[in-house]
UniProtKB/Swiss-Prot annotation:
Its cofactor is [4Fe-4S] cluster; Mo-bis(molybdopterin guanine dinucleotide). This is Nitrate reductase alpha subunit. The alpha chain is the actual site of nitrate reduction. Supports anaerobic growth of E.coli on glycerol in an E.coli mutant lacking endogenous nitrate reductase. One of the activities induced in M.tuberculosis by hypoxia is the dissimilatory reduction of nitrate to nitrite, which serves to provide energy as the bacteria adapt to anaerobiosis. Pfam families: Molybdopterin, Molydop_binding. The keyword Protein biosynthesis does not apply. GO terms for molecular function: 4 iron, 4 sulfur cluster binding; metal ion binding; molybdopterin cofactor binding; nitrate reductase (quinone) activity; nitrate reductase activity. It catalyses: nitrate + a quinol = a quinone + nitrite + H2O. The lineage of its organism: Bacteria, Bacillati, Actinomycetota, Actinomycetes, Mycobacteriales.
Amino acid sequence: MTVTPHVGGPLEELLERSGRFFTPGEFSADLRTVTRRGGREGDVFYRDRWSHDKVVRSTHGVNCTGSCSWKIYVKDGIITWETQQTDYPSVGPDRPEYEPRGCPRGASFSWYSYSPTRVRYPYARGVLVEMYREAKTRLGDPVLAWADIQADPERRRRYQQARGKGGLVRVSWAEASEMVAAAHVHTIKTYGPDRVAGFSPIPAMSMVSHAAGSRFVELIGGVMTSFYDWYADLPVASPQVFGDQTDVPESGDWWDASYLVMWGSNVPITRTPDAHWMAEARYRGAKVVVVSPDYADNTKFADEWVRCAAGTDTALAMAMGHVILSECYVRNQVPFFVDYVRRYTDLPFLIKLEKRGDLLVPGKFLTAADIGEESENAAFKPALLDELTNTVVVPQGSLGFRFGEDGVGKWNLDLGSVVPALSVEMDKAVNGDRSAELVTLPSFDTIDGHGETVSRGVPVRRAGKHLVCTVFDLMLAHYGVARAGLPGEWPTGYHDRTQQNTPAWQESITGVPAAQAIRFAKEFARNATESGGRSMIIMGGGICHWFHSDVMYRSVLALLMLTGSMGRNGGGWAHYVGQEKVRPLTGWQTMAMATDWSRPPRQVPGASYWYAHTDQWRYDGYGADKLASPVGRGRFAGKHTMDLLTSATAMGWSPFYPQFDRSSLDVADEARAAGRDVGDYVAEQLAQHKLKLSITDPDNPVNWPRVLTVWRANLIGSSGKGGEYFLRHLLGTDSNVQSDPPTDGVHPRDVVWDSDIPEGKLDLIMSIDFRMTSTTLVSDVVLPAATWYEKSDLSSTDMHPYVHSFSPAIDPPWETRSDFDAFAAIARAFSALAKRHLGTRTDVVLTALQHDTPDEMAYPDGTERDWLATGEVPVPGRTMSKLTVVERDYTAIYDKWLTLGPLIDQFGMTTKGYTVHPFREVSELAANFGVMNSGVAVGRPAITTAKRMADVILALSGTCNGRLAVEGFLELEKRTGQRLAHLAEGSEERRITYADTQARPVPVITSPEWSGSESGGRRYAPFTINIEHLKPFHTLTGRMHFYLAHDWVEELGEQLPVYRPPLDMARLFNQPELGPTDDGLGLTVRYLTPHSKWSFHSTYQDNLYMLSLSRGGPTMWMSPGDAAKINVRDNDWVEAVNANGIYVCRAIVSHRMPEGVVFVYHVQERTVDTPRTETNGKRGGNHNALTRVRIKPSHLAGGYGQHAFAFNYLGPTGNQRDEVTVVRRRSQEVRY
């Protein structure tokens, strides 16, 4: 029997029983239970806080690449908070799921809805409003009022100099729209439409909002400036190697990798919603390697850290290539690799060797024309050597087969019975025509980066009258991989430090031990062999933002191509910098570029545009030949970068606007008055210098941009490299530029140099935003935008296969409007004013020679023919830009903006070279939306709401409309002769609508708009269609390229990947040498601006939650060693100064940082905790105050193969990683 222990006695029992009289509640008989009622009033607050009336699906349009679906909670008409959606479709068994997706930044967005930074009403610059109202009262016409202000230099300078100094006043939507419309009408009437520009980046992050504004700009004949290249997020190597902008795997494909490298991409920070795939791949057994100069957040996830000095990654990749070529191609041959490069790369193709003085140097591809073939497009059909027959043959699939009747059914990678020989060494030496020759190659591994040469032997043979070798032969010579019997300077082994591209050579440059580089290369290759190419490299801004990023990327891509990893699930490259992938591509570009109403659109590379119009070119005092190869032809001798930009514009390689030194509308009138064909008239006038390209005199007031609209962007506070030059020259307000244009440097020969440098080119800068930023603060008109929780829109990304919706959880509060509604108001006001001042005009539109068109064959061999230099009469579309005459009915802009135009019925829609015809879709849209019943748009489908525009974008895109996907593949089948339509068959009746995206995340359809397959739920990987279905790459050979044969690439010595160190800022720009300054108070360091943990670009960096989680305000990360040199302790105020500007911030001293490098995270705006400087007493700048735009000539190459312009496909990058700055400790007493 169990005895219950008894504690206490009668006294205790008495106390227990008495206690019930003093304790609230009801007691049980045994006193063991007390029941209390009430007292929970405090819970009401908690329950009320988390109660809500409805939940709405939306996402964030912040260019974070996440495109995460969120639940937005609303109570009493107020947005209260957000949480992650959890209804993503399953990716299948045996792999992790996509959900939940999100990050702390996204989870804090609702703070913005009611924050102090919210733009609630339309604003305009007070002094300008006063001028405008007075002039309008006096003249009675908005356009005349605007013209009156611009005609008075004193009044114009008054409001320009007020930019950024406060003084914004509330105005009505009607007055703001009228003022903006008047500025547009006046500019078009006086100067021409190409003096109007729009800047809005990353359409994938909110397609409707982007298209609404871009559509207006293009309909009036204005210019859309690019962003992908301007941000330096575009890896120019992608068009150079693949002929593709950037197509990359979704993050779910990382799971399939068995060797995963993060090279210049800090995945946990910049790809937070997707980082779990990286960790899970490692748990699955993949080895994870990180290449970075600092101990970054992703380093702690890695199995191995390869600590490579900043900006020297090319040297490491070249050394790894040396090992892979030695181990897998020369000492042994890995059949998997050899078979791959024979079919899918240009390694077997023949290169002509040419004499240059006493030297033998690599030249251009041997083509069918060189060996006497007279077939169509013979000059664009490169040749190779058939190993079986020992004869030179012309394989199918090259550019010459892509266009023209002879190529129908032959543009494919089917080699038939041909076995491409990788080397002429495989030749059987018929008639003794095989021998070896010394070829001279460039090298740039000196400290200052100037070129030297190395001579190495290659096996050669004759092909007709030409001495040739293969690309592979040149690769081995260039990488320093010796073969028996070949003369020249060769490494004695991996540990030879004296010869370029060996592991020991790279150690002295990168700091990576030679043994580690050798093991890294061997592991990478061995894994590819054993796994069938499942070696993957995630790449990003860490190596993409450098001046020489193209060769840096090409050297890394070479590793993937040599190991057969491209075009494989779980293998290849994975470049992520920016939310670039507009999955419904065709529909978006039709809407955004207004090609349903007028063609072609005006598009310009952003870096070229801002380089010229912010006068940053004037501060470049070095000759372009400083970058040239020692074995070049001297094409850049004595030329300034601006001369090369002028030549590229003249030859039609790269566009620039404005076009002419007078209005393009007036030029059309002149040609008509002369009774001449417009093309002939323009060419003749240009040759006689009676008409000039504006690029030859960009500082002449007639050639200035006059009106700039910025929306969905923060140009001045985020992406404006050389921000202080924007302020000084474009906007005409105060700046902190610390230098003057050099007087003793190289000045342009073909561009007017005037000692009077303009300040204040723009008549109007207008921005649309939901929060106050550095851009809105300098704008003349600020329109209040709806946030991402207050409008209808679409989002997609590279990272996952879904299309997401934005949905309005509430109506836009105060006087805010969606971008769609804002541009509707502006277009309506514009058309009303145009009735009196513009009417219908004829416009002459110049457009660069385009990628994915026959324009790629304009310049055989990529040989420049500069009519500006020779005095010849240019030929439009051949030796200069294409010329198109466009009729613009300016009175009907609003009606056209609001409807789907007839050109898609007439000409179809072309994407990446194939055309589809959406007759059925147009009829369906007309039936669903109704049609316009009057005016020029009568009978056309009405797009009167943002929801409707979203549905149009989806309906016109193969990724969201299975019928168009199948039609596109059938069209490609005719040209390729390969079966492709099966990739989308079964989807013919499938449609994705805006309502579908509101219901849940919707995966897209496999479409020829992109290079990978998603059929059957497959994880998306790029180029799988090329590899598995023999569709050629969009390049000269139809294969992936190691070798580039364009004149301007050759002049730089970059036909093959080559190590080029960071720019020598001391030699080229007279900046201080790295290290302590002469006075010992400062330290010159390399200045890098990586992406931030606490913001996406400038969004969230001013968010109260993120300011609380981070250090808050402007900061600079530096190493303890560097900090000690200038007596800086953690959290001290420091000041950074260089020729471009001044930056004031607090120091974060951390052991994770290498010496000689500082990080200022992108973006830290001037709107948070930015004090005055000690240098000049003005307020300090932002992270871009210390940067400046520099143009690399090879990025301007055009008119030949994959080197041809397309918007955001190819253009100079706004690189900024080569900068240096002097940092010093400043007074800790800061003033604001």
